[in-house]
Amino acid sequence: MTPTFEIPKRAMAIFAHPDDVDFGCSGTLASWIESAGTHVTYCVITSGQKGTHDPEVTPAEMAETRQREQRAAGEAIGVKEFVFLGHQDGELERTMALRGEVCRVIREHRPDVVFTNDPWSHYQIHPDHRVAGWSALDGVIAARDHLFFPEQLTGGLKKHRVSRVLLFGTRDPNIWFDIGTTVDRKIAALRAHKSQLGGRKGFAERMRWWAKNTGSTWKLPAAEAFRYIELA
């Protein structure tokens, strides 16, 4: 882990689809929960209802399955709270309405640190991933100032300042977290997504290789890497 990073009391991951968080940062979150008791909230923007090649499965059935799988994956590492915004898979747009939704979730759950997709990542071709990252960052900025979405503050909800952001799926990492003791829990979380990963041979071995390769930069047994942004 470098540079020096204080593990937060509260963290939130904001991401496009069920399973994005488990690929991106579940090993780090599992480590924080285990070592420091960090309270973690997941905010899933879309329902992932297009994530099937089976013509017999309806979008509504897929959405229900993927929400259930994401809850199981989160619970496998100790996540306590889940927010499902229910947007259409593959159709996210960077709108003020979505920014307001994310802003409200941040104000309600009050994380110290937010994880999200890196919207600047080179060759990030999935539009939902780009929009999720932008909307999360836009929401972080909006949540801290009372003149953004002031209607949210009339019922006792208060503005909230996120102090740090960690971007996963980045090509430009500047911080690495040791997940040597939690890589198996990361794999267990990913295995909960049976509709997406069921039956893939060698999956666990590939995940361990990926974590080991990521950690090699800092001579860690296994790691996840992020772009770290400290907010003024």
Model feature map: region roles:
Residues 1-12, 93-232:
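Metal-dependent de-N-acetylase/amidase catalytic core
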Residues 1-109:
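Active-site rim/loop-helix segments in enzyme catalytic domains that contact anionic ligands
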